[in-house]
């Protein structure tokens, strides 16, 4: 399971749409998203409530504690919202040790309220943990002893009896409405493959539950069965403060288009030990698996090699190719893609004084290793080739010794 955070705007959109479908509960929530490209005149035309109601505006950037950080404005009209956004859009802020500009806001109706409730659902290995409190809001952590929690195993449904411990201390007249709401939210959680969902707080407006602040995470491995029919045009933003380089973005796009797994993250662009499977002065994390075809591996390897050979400084560098023993990835086929890329980058490899260490096992590995040995002699680039008899730690040690040796 890959837990991916989604924006509050999308969390509320999904909840509103599917809570009605699954539980017959029609949430009266409204929200609008504002970015650099937003035309406020057009936005108000599309959502007229923005010009008739008092509003709340806050960043929608996957970080919490917005209220405590002074990033939430309450009881504004649309002109004040526009000014608030203008003053902060693109401005860098620091949250949790990460710095990044604010690029996305959510605008909602201002809802005066007295009571704040807390609700969270977390997917666990054998089921789900559901937590509820009558003391929600920004002080929830200080009142965690008042949170009630149940665990619901995967095979058990959310029945009134299962929900009862969560709402046992509520006034009798509130238990039915809030209990039905919790059961409905849990149905949405399961049906849409949420892995985490939190409302802190939600309140009651005109007798109906109303989420004020919400966070959500989806299991993106469920995209094949839910993305089109249920998630709609969902966005999985990068974590706050994380920006993809052009090379990382290329591999990310390649990964999105294949059933295989292709990952690449630059950790230290000036490092001298580079990997083409799992990250090794280590400069990158890189991984390919799931039987990518030769063309996909070729494109992937080009990116890694361009990064690994950039800005030669006269010092030796090392490239680790391979990894563990493959289960079903055809080593011969994937190595063919890598070999094509190595041939293309021959001059860059030599300029960077690259030493290559290969270790691989699995289907057709003998063919792949034989091709690599032949390539070393043809290119005049040092390539040491090992099969499953060698260890990954062994070639890592060789790579470290190589780059640390005197030039």
From Swiss-Prot:
Catalyzed reactions: oxaloacetate + acetyl-CoA + ADP + phosphate = citrate + ATP + CoA
Keywords noted in UniProt: Acyltransferase, ATP-binding, Cytoplasm, Lipid biosynthesis, Lipid metabolism, Nucleotide-binding, Transferase
GO biological process: lipid metabolic process
GO molecular-function terms, A-Z: ATP binding; ATP citrate synthase activity
GO cellular component terms, semicolon-separated: cytosol
Function: ATP citrate-lyase is the primary enzyme responsible for the synthesis of cytosolic acetyl-CoA, used for the elongation of fatty acids and biosynthesis of isoprenoids, flavonoids and malonated derivatives. May supply substrate to the cytosolic acetyl-CoA carboxylase, which generates the malonyl-CoA used for the synthesis of a multitude of compounds, including very long chain fatty acids and flavonoids. In contrast to all known animal ACL enzymes having a homomeric structure, plant ACLs are composed of alpha and beta chains.
Protein name, entry field: ATP-citrate synthase subunit alpha chain protein 1
């Amino acid at each position: 399971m890959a837990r991916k955070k989604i924006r509050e705007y999308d969390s509320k959109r999904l909840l509103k749409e599917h809570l009605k479908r699954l539980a017959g509960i029609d949430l009266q929530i409204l929200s609008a998203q504002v970015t650099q490209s937003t035309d406020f005149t057009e936005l108000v035309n599309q959502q007229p409530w923005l010009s008739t109601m008092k509003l709340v505006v806050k960043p929608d950037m996957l970080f919490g504690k917005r209220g405590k950080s002074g990033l939430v404005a309450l009881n504004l009209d649309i002109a004040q919202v526009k000014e608030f956004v203008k003053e902060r859009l693109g401005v860098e802020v620091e949250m949790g040790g990460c710095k990044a500009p604010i690029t996305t806001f959510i605008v909602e109706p201002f809802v005066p309220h007295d009571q704040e409730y807390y609700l969270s659902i977390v997917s666990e290995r054998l089921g789900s943990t559901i937590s509820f409190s009558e003391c929600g809001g920004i002080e929830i952590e200080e009142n965690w002893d008042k949170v009630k929690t149940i665990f619901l195993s995967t095979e058990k449904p959310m029945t009134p009896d299962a929900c009862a411990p969560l709402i046992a201390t509520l006034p009798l007249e509130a238990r039915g409405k809030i209990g039905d709401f919790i059961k409905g939210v849990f149905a949405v959680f399961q049906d849409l493959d949420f892995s985490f969902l939190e409302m802190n707080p939600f309140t009651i407006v005109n007798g109906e539950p109303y989420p004020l602040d919400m966070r959500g995470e989806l299991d993106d491995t469920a995209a094949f069965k839910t993305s089109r029919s249920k998630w709609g045009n969902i966005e999985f933003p990068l974590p706050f403060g994380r920006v993809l380089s052009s090379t990382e973005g290329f591999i990310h796009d390649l990964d999105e288009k294949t059933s295989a797994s292709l990952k690449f993250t630059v950790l230290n662009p000036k490092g001298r030990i580079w990997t083409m499977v799992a990250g090794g002065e280590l400069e990158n994390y890189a991984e390919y698996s799931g039987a990518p075809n030769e063309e996909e591996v070729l494109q992937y390897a080009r990116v890694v090699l361009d990064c690994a050979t950039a800005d030669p400084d006269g010092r030796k560098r090392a490239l680790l190719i391979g990894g563990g023993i493959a289960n079903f990835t055809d080593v011969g086929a994937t190595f063919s893609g890598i070999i094509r890329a190595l041939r293309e980058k021959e001059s860059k490899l030599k300029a960077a004084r690259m030493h290559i260490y290969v270790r691989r096992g699995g289907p057709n590995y003998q063919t792949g290793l034989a091709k690599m040995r032949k390539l070393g002699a043809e290119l005049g680039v040092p390539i040491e080739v090992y099969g499953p008899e060698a260890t990954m730690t062994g070639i890592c040690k060789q790579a470290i010794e190589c780059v640390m040796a005197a030039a």
